[in-house]
């Protein structure tokens, strides 16, 4: 009970504060207290210990010591710079490999491939930026035929339509069919914008399908590595391809 009474008595006790800086020495600057001195002293001793340890390490250094880290380091302006290793797996690939199964990734890849085929059939890859330009080759027997050759006459179409790879009607069709009125400029812009949007979507889906294929290959490679068969790494893993191993040939029973 006495301890409880002592605590209760201390609640009404006067608070003892540390003496502030006297007015007559204010011109000399801030008066350092003991807690300030301890912080300064501890910081000083910590730095001295660190310097002492560095001097000892420099004295005891073996000039013939070697670390494998030295093979990818060089000294530039007195500073050691280490070569950065090439990224083998992206963060998105690593997340997929850790959280998803190979069957799920293969299913998503097949779904993306089907969507790509559907978009290709709708767009017919008209003026697609990633598509290789096709060539139309004409064959002739003599040089005179080559000199007299005219593309528009040969294709039986108007000269203005020669550069088209699609919707290139013949002159007979143009004479028979009724020509529709000119499309407004706003309508043409809207159609071009929608088509560009579809091409962007197609490009993204093609890239995603490639990434899913790479992830599936990397997961399969990691599964194959669980086999105890002796193997040798032939090619390192990169962002766009899995590592390649050569396994020891084993005769199956």
UniProtKB/Swiss-Prot annotation:
Localization in the cell: Nucleus, Nucleolus
Please give the InterPro entries that the UniProt record associates with this protein.
Answer: SSU_processome_Utp11
Any one biological process term the GO annotation gives:
nervous system development
For this protein, the record's Pfam families field holds: Utp11
GO CC, any one term: cytosol
Question: What keyword terms does UniProt attach to this protein?
Answer: Isopeptide bond, Nucleus, Phosphoprotein, rRNA processing, Ubl conjugation
Q: Where is this region: Disordered?
A: 1-26
Sites of Phosphoserine modification: 241
Top-level lineage group: Eukaryota
Residues modified to Phosphothreonine:
90
Main location per the UniProt record: nucleus
Annotated signal peptide:
none
Mind telling me where the Glycyl lysine isopeptide (Lys-Gly) (interchain with G-Cter in SUMO2) cross-link is?
74, 83, 86, 103, 120, 143-144, 180, 218, 235-236
Q: What does this protein do?
A: Part of the small subunit (SSU) processome, first precursor of the small eukaryotic ribosomal subunit. During the assembly of the SSU processome in the nucleolus, many ribosome biogenesis factors, an RNA chaperone and ribosomal proteins associate with the nascent pre-rRNA and work in concert to generate RNA folding, modifications, rearrangements and cleavage as well as targeted degradation of pre-ribosomal RNA by the RNA exosome. Involved in nucleolar processing of pre-18S ribosomal RNA.
Family under the similarity heading: Belongs to the UTP11 family.
- Subunit structure, per the record? Part of the small subunit (SSU) processome, composed of more than 70 proteins and the RNA chaperone small nucleolar RNA (snoRNA) U3.
**Name this protein carries in UniProt:** Probable U3 small nucleolar RNA-associated protein 11
Q: What is the lineage of its organism?
A: Eukaryota, Metazoa, Chordata, Craniata, Vertebrata
Per the record, the gene is Utp11
